[in-house]
Amino acid sequence: MHYVSVEGLGKSYGVKPLFEDITFHIEEGDKIALVARNGSGKSTLLKILAGKETAESGTVWIHKDVTVALFEQEPVFAEGKSVLDNIFYHNHPVINAIREYERAEDEGDADRMTDAIVKMDELGAWDFDTKVKQILGKLNIHHLQQTAGSLSGGQRKRVALAKTLIDIGFEHKHVLLIMDEPTNHLDVEMVEWLEHYLNQEKVTLLLVTHDRYFLDAVCEEIWELDG
């Protein structure tokens, strides 16, 4: 399946061009690393693909059935809400059930836990909850009632990574996962787990990273952005 076509893309800040006349195509199952010197516009290009910035020239076509999931270097949260509510923000019966189950478990509320278990059974939500617990555990995310605004920089990155992985695992069959420096603030064990997870999940991936070992382990193509 053809996911993305980019033709003649250009972007500048002031009089200085970040990049010009970029053309590429992404197919389902591609795992691509984007490399360039600092300041060449890698992060900007990723944001354009995700619809968070606009190009000054060229076109971006994304298949109507493809959802773009962007993991950014500076994640944005609802600062006053809990980690739990930031991760499980979808209004969907399965997500609502898992959110209620995780909240009851985190707070040790036996009555709410019983009700939540019944709802999880009704919706067949246990398989996805198992995946959620694996992601949270591997990324060392345990205090789900903590507010997002109280998280350290490293915690914010790990919560954002968990949120991204849970999103792509839950809702969409056809996802282009765009990741901007995902291994920053991860220890060696977490990086190895993320490498295994991305390979196991067979995602379509566009990656920016300075971690050459991670890049070689996960990606099958390397594109160089001139600038």
Predicted features and spans:
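ABC ATP-binding cassette signature C-motif
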Residues: 1-227
